[in-house]
Amino acid sequence: MAGTDWLSARRTELAADRILDAAERLFTQRDPASIGMNEIAKAAGCSRATLYRYFDSREALRTAYVHRETRRLGREIMVKIADVVEPAERLLVSITTTLRMVRDNPALAAWFTTTRPPIGGEMAGRSEVIAALAAAFLNSLGPDDPTTVERRARWVVRMLTSLLMFPGRDEADERAMIAEFVVPIVTPASAAARKAGHPGPE
């Protein structure tokens, strides 16, 4: 029975991924806010009834897609910054890498176009998954008060969505702004103290 349950769960996961892959192809072609469930079902090669078995609403499908891509980006970013050790630099590189990777992905970049409804920013702002991943990353930089980390994580998400919708003049300009206005505030106090040559808080 356990083996059957595992196979069933795996088939469900594969079917859901196939639907999300079809939705992603549509997101590269048109405004994500304008794409309905009928179009996604057709692109995925399934019926509406089948689509609704996996995602009970368009909002649920969008959320699943955003969370899948957020986790994927998170894994790729951790690989890219694996050799960066110093916490402040690690934070800076992770933010600039996130911006670059989202912009380089047409399906993701479409969610942050200012000429369309700001669904990317809205979803990022209310996603517990995105906030939790941001908080986990900040925790990896050094110990700090959990409430402070959670608040900073939410602020980092808002800062990222703001830059995705309203970019700086170029990458160098954005990097300078992040280094000046974000890194000193968001880097944990313990890490900042170590860099300054002082022991951090116990």
Swiss-Prot record:
Query: Keyword Transit peptide on this protein?
Result: no
DNA-binding feature ranges: 36-55
Q: Which keywords accompany this UniProt record?
A: DNA-binding, Repeat, Transcription, Transcription regulation
Sequence ranges assigned to domain HTH tetR-type in this UniProt record: 13-73
**Sorted alphabetically, which InterPro entries does this protein's record hold?**
Homeodomain-like_sf (IPR009057), HTH-type_TetR-like_transc_reg (IPR050109), HTH_TetR (IPR001647)
Entry's Gene Ontology molecular function annotations:
DNA-binding transcription factor activity; transcription cis-regulatory region binding
Gene Ontology terms describing biological process: regulation of DNA-templated transcription
Return the Pfam families for the record: TetR_N (PF00440)
Does the UniProt entry include the keyword NADP? no
UniProt-listed PANTHER family: HTH-TYPE TRANSCRIPTIONAL REGULATOR RUTR, HTH-TYPE TRANSCRIPTIONAL REPRESSOR BDCR
Task: List the protein's name.
Answer: Uncharacterized HTH-type transcriptional regulator Rv1255c
| Organism encoding this protein | Mycobacterium tuberculosis (strain ATCC 25618 / H37Rv)
